[in-house]
Structure formats: structure tokens, C-alpha cells
């Protein structure tokens, strides 16, 4: 069989597994808002089956729209009794439509920039320096909303872009002060590189505190998930090749991530994209080293954070879809939060329900994404938490927007930021105690 997104062979096999039970209706965030069969997994499978049988063609009105009414959140995959990989059926069908109908010209331009790190860095640096001219600052969130209608919804809150991308602010090799336990590569992802550099700085601090040597490869760029999600399988494949070549050359023990979607790209999609190439074995070797930072910290380093004091805070946790259902990381962030003595952790009723972001979905379907987000805001508010903690930059952006739109009062932070603050506070306490002992 060819690679899953290269032809429709994989999709054909997966479609045949579906017994049309409708269990997916219970968990699909989009269906729960629209109640339209074409938006749920079963409906999409019927559409793809019709496409495979020639009953519809790629230009059929409504086909592309329905195939893009999917967050690829994997909730349907998780509940499917037949094990149908519905998200990959959707990705394969989107790729087929692009092969037959072509890619929208604007997407071509955007994906070309995303695929070229120097162009991306230049564009994002200019954006950071001139953001105030196009966007207005929001006091409540610290983010920005558009001043003019230029493709973004005027209500959309976007983060403050860094004046200088994170990767430009650190050396490639970062050694701890003490003996190094492990040597890891850090894939920053776009959000922590350009939008939330404090997440990346916090990661570096946590690794330093645990005597982990960190390599930050300068030639890394976008993981390719947004490109693959829009059906540009060719560019996604090129991006996968770039990263496999880069990371296979590094003598590291693990490749660590602060974003579940980026990690899932390396772990799952790169071997799939490169299955029919001579880089397949290398892709599998790279994938075998992929870990979320929290998984690595607790299960490899076996760090003990129970003695780290920080500011007293009540928090809840939102599960990023690809981190929980894709990477299987669920317990580790909660264990970190529960073990910090000054953090009171309160679980939501539906912590694993998608926030409605799905990267660019919240840009192209803003109102629907906010309808989905409203449920999350209500769930958050019911906990009485002051801070919502999560493990994905895209989720941080969406949750921040939702707090503003629906009158929430929570700060949104990444788990690694909470832990980094605790390490910093512990160091301050240690300095104070040493000073006290010297003055006695």
C-alpha cells in the first residue's frame, strides 16, 4: 500500500471498517453544535465512500466544505468500536481534493512562507515590530484585535508577537551547570517561537534545573501539521523530509516538544508521509525519540517537584486533543500540578473536550469555533479556577479569546510555565535562607 496521504488506498480500507453505528455523534464537537450529519464522522465517511465510488467528484458543491468541517481532534477515533482512523480518512480526502482541484492561491503563498524559515522569521519579526499599526491592544487579555477587516474576524484575539523569535535569542547548544543527565533536542514549534516565547524559555529553565543538555536546532521550522490539514500533502512531505534529515543528524537521546500537535507530526505523520521513500526508516528512528516534555521529565528524568513552592493558586487543566489522544499524555501534567504544594488543582467535567481551535479552523470558522469554546468556558468557570493550564500554544490562543468573548476571568498558562515559576521561586527562597544563615 502507498503512504496514507499519497493515494486513497488507505482511506478505502478505513471506510470499509465503518458500521455506521453513530457513536461518533456523542463526541464530535462540531456535530454537537450543528446537528448536521455531514459534519460528523459517519457522514464524512459516507461522503468519502461516494467519492471513492465516483458518485461525487472533487468539484461537487459542499464536498470540500464538509471535509473541512473537522477539527481532527480524534474524539471519534477514541470512541469508535471498529477502530476507524477517521481523522486520517479526512486528511487523505483533503489531499485528494488538492491533487484534483489544486490549492487555493492564498494557501499556496502562506504555505510557501511557512516552508521557508528565513521568510517566516522575517515576516513574523516585521509583524512583531508593526503589530500595533494593524491591531489594537486588549487590556483584559494582553492580546490584540484587528483594527481593519483584512481576513481575520474583527473579534479575533491574537497574541502579542515576539519582536525577535525565541530561536534567535538562544545558542544552539545549551549545557547545564552540573553534569548532564541527558542530551535532548528541542523542537520549539511556531507558537512558542513567535507568539509565546516565555513557554520556550520556561522549558529551557526546567531542563537546566534538571541537568539536561538542550540542543535548539536553528534550521527547524513549522512541523507541517497546518499544511497537511489543508491537503497540501506535497509540501507537508517536503517539510517532513527537512526535519527528518535535520534531527537524524543530532546525537541526542530524545526530541522534546511543548506542543502535542507538533509532537504528533513527528511521531505519527512523518513516518506516514515518508512511507514510500528511502527516508522511511530514518523517519521511524526519529519518531522513536519523540516525547512531550512532561512525559520525559516525570518518566525518564523522574524529577520530584513536590518540594517546590510557588504562589498559591487554584488551577484547572485543559487537555489538548493531540497531546491526550494523539500522544497519550494525560496523567503527567496533572501529576505536576497536583504535586506542587501551593497549587490547588480542580478537574473540569469535560477536560478533554476540544476547545474549537484546531489551528487554522478557528480562523476560517470563527463563530463555530467560538460556539464550541463557549462550552469550555462554562466548564472552566464551574471549577472556580483562577488559572487554566494547558499544553498547547494554539489552545492558549483559543482559550484566551474565549475568556474575553464570554466574560471569563482566568489567566491561561502552559504547564511548563507553572513549573518554571516554581523552580524560580525555590531558588529565591534558597538565596534568602542562605542570607539569613550568614547574618545569624
Regions from the PLM with identified roles:
Residues 1-7, 31-62, 83-110, 408-416:
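Non-heme iron-sulfur electron-transfer modules
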Residues 16, 35-39, 227-234:
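Alpha-helix capping and helix-loop boundary segments enriched in small/acidic/polar residues
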Residues 13-22, 26, 68-78, 221, ...:
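Cys/His-enriched microdomains
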Residues 19, 23-47, 64, 69-96, ...:
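Iron-sulfur cluster-binding cysteine motifs and their immediate structural context
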Residues 12-13, 29, 75, 185-189, ...:
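Glycine- and acidic
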Residues 4, 14-17, 38, 56, ...:
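Hydrophobic alpha-helical scaffolding
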Residues 86-440:
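Iron-sulfur cluster-binding electron-transfer modules in prokaryotic oxidoreductases
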Residues 1-20, 33-36, 49-72, 311, ...:
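Ferredoxin-like iron-sulfur electron-transfer modules
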